[in-house]
Amino acid sequence: MQIFKRISMMIGLLLLTATMAFADAKTHKIAFHVDESDPKVMNMALNNVQNVSNYYAGKGEKVIIELVAYGPGLNMFVKGKSPVEDRISVMSMSVDGLTFSACGNTHRKMSEKAGKDVALIDGVGMAPSGVVRLVELQEQGYAYVRP
């Protein structure tokens, strides 16, 4: 009977330790902002996203990243036009905790100008307003990065 008590205590301690370690693990939240139609800026933003993700994964820490593009930067997300389309497609499937958000205001204006709905790269979501989305993320404690 003593052995069962000891085993139960050991299991309890292991569960408590695992729970405490999980509770101590910090979740990093980062918002990236792109508002330029410059491939260098787009690639720098994606490099930053990948580097940050790799860094925290290497430390065993969780990271949530949202890249928001508006204005001329929305070209980053336009299907068939984006100079970084392949990278976005791969990263949207391979980087845990990564979200791409297009500005709905910019998208609407681009679509009106084009006379048709401008298609976005698969995996890119839509925010009603890119600026408002960045404000919301910062209010939620996200660090702000503009490459």
PLM regions: where:
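Bacterial N-terminal signal peptides
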Residues: 10-19
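N-terminal targeting signals for Sec/Tat export/insertion, comprising classic cleavable signal peptides
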Residues: 33-60
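Structural recognition of the beta-strand scaffold that forms the well-ordered cores
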Residues: 31-33, 66-69, 99-102, 145-146
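Bacterial N-terminal signal peptides that target proteins for export
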Residues: 1-11
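Acidic/histidine-rich, surface-exposed loop or edge segments in extracytoplasmic proteins
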Residues: 24-37, 68-72
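Short helix-terminating capping/connector loops at secondary-structure junctions
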Residues: 25, 58-63, 95
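A cross-taxonomic marker for long C-terminal extensions/tails that follow the last structured domain
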Residues: 78-147
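Acidic helix-start/capping segments at beta-turn-to-alpha-helix junctions
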Residues: 63-77, 106
